[in-house]
A protein has these predicted regions:
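Two-component/phosphorelay signaling modules centered on CheY-like receiver
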Residues: 12-32
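Acidic, metal-coordinating helix/loop segments flanking the phosphotransfer/catalytic sites
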Residues: 33-51
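Acidic catalytic/metal-coordinating carboxylates
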Residues: 36, 62-65
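Short amphipathic alpha-helix used as the core "switch/output" element in two-component signaling
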Residues: 42, 64-76
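Alpha4 helix (beta4-alpha4-beta5 surface) of REC/receiver domains from two-component response regulators
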Residues: 65, 86-102, 113
């Protein structure tokens, strides 16, 4: 079964940047995109994801709230919260809900490091 990654950001350009970085590292992984938390949760209820890459600042529920809800659905799933807001409080709150904080603009190096840590946690082949 294909490794499924949920990418959530209200900005199409940001989703494209995240997808590009992910594809460069893991071209065989299936990417599914959503524009907001409600859409993401609807997709998550249709079938499980192996990883989630979430924007922090979105209309409606933010990435922190979405990360917490996704962790309830799939405990232990690697989740990254991606934001240009580098406040310590945001980073700490991300960790509190079981997410890893990645700064925007997202670099391929940061994505690679996150995937490596996720591979180690999940025992994913190719990690």
């Amino acid at each position: 079964m294909a490794f499924r990654v949920l990418i959530v950001d209200d900005s199409k350009l940001a989703r494209m940047a995240v997808a590009k970085a992910l594809t460069a590292l893991r071209p065989d992984w299936t990417r599914v995109e959503a524009t907001n938390a409600d859409e993401a949760l609807a997709l998550a209820h249709q079938g499980p994801f192996d990883m989630a890459l979430l924007d922090f600042n979105m209309p409606g529920r933010d990435g922190l709230a979405l990360a917490a809800e996704l962790q309830e659905l799939s405990p232990g799933m690697p989740v990254a919260l991606i934001s240009a807001n580098l406040q310590v409080e945001i980073v700490n709150r991300a960790q509190d809900v079981g997410a890893e904080f990645l700064p925007k603009p997202l670099t391929q190096e940061a994505m690679s490091a996150f995937i490596t840590r996720a591979d180690q946690r999940l025992g994913t082949p190719g990690g």
